Amino acid sequence: VTTIVNTDQDQAWNGPEGAHWARHQDRWNAVNDGFNTPLLDAARIADGHRTLDIGCGAGHTTRLAALRAPHGHALGLDLSGPMLAEARARAVADGIHNVTFTRGDAQTHPFEQSAEGPFDAAISRYGAMFFADPELAFGNIRRALRPGGRLALVCPSDPELNGWVTAMTSLRGILPVGDFGRPGLPGMFSLAAPDRVRAVLAAAGFTGVTIEETRAYGTWGRDATDAADFLLATGPGRHLMDSADEPARARARAALTDHLGAHETADGTVRLLSTAWLVTAERS
């Protein structure tokens, strides 16, 4: 049984935020799927391998890892009960049987007691930035790997190189938009500085750290109006809209729709660039 020490994130991901992500999982996959192949290739998952997916959410990358190792196994770990329920249902619907999902805190989860371990690879697509104590978490993840086991993760780089951030900051004259996090503090951009990533992984005992930039376009909506509605329903957008009066909300929605209109493609869909770090390391 995991002791949950990351209580702030536990409350967030088992409340409205977790419910939102579970409900809109297909949309979030449309945003982030461009990172799947680089991530899984970097993890070097082979048939028979056991893979640990950290912050697995609704389990899309966990299922992809399981498909790469039909005679292996994939374990998805997340704090969010709503997203894990979705993950289990989708695995059943897809007929993927070599996958399991567990609710737990990567900082403290007793991986050494897991029947699925030790693991050949640990992966994370945008799920490793929210630890209250990242050194503790990554140290625990390292111990879950076999000697020679491999870590591969994708995490956002500079906020200004991510189109959704640029879209939201365009509203600063209308809504009280602050920054979206910074290296060293739990949040989306806690690992945005490569030196911070190297320091955390070194403190956790990882070796052979590599960090390279990777970019992908994600689909945020079927048109600018739909994309604006979606962005304003996400965690940051929802909090900003809740803090504003109705005239400000209407102005923000119109301004964001106008901004996103410049990113509509030939079929009308809105595609925004995301820039991330692809990080790998090993347990020696």
Which residues does each predicted region cover?
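Conserved class I S-adenosyl-L-methionine
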Residues: 2-49, 60-64, 86, 105-108
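Conserved Class I S-adenosyl-L-methionine
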Residues: 2-3, 12, 20, 24, ...
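Class I SAM-dependent methyltransferase SAM/SAH-binding core
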Residues: 50-111, 136
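Conserved hydrophobic residues forming the short capping helix/wall of the S-adenosyl-L-methionine
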Residues: 69, 91, 172, 201, ...
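Short glycine-dipeptide loop
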Residues: 71, 145-151
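A short acidic, Gly/Pro-enriched loop at the edge of an enzyme's catalytic core
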Residues: 107-122
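A short SAM/SAH-binding and catalytic strip from SAM-dependent methyltransferases
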Residues: 120-135, 157
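Conserved catalytic/acceptor-binding region of the Class I
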Residues: 135, 150-222, 238
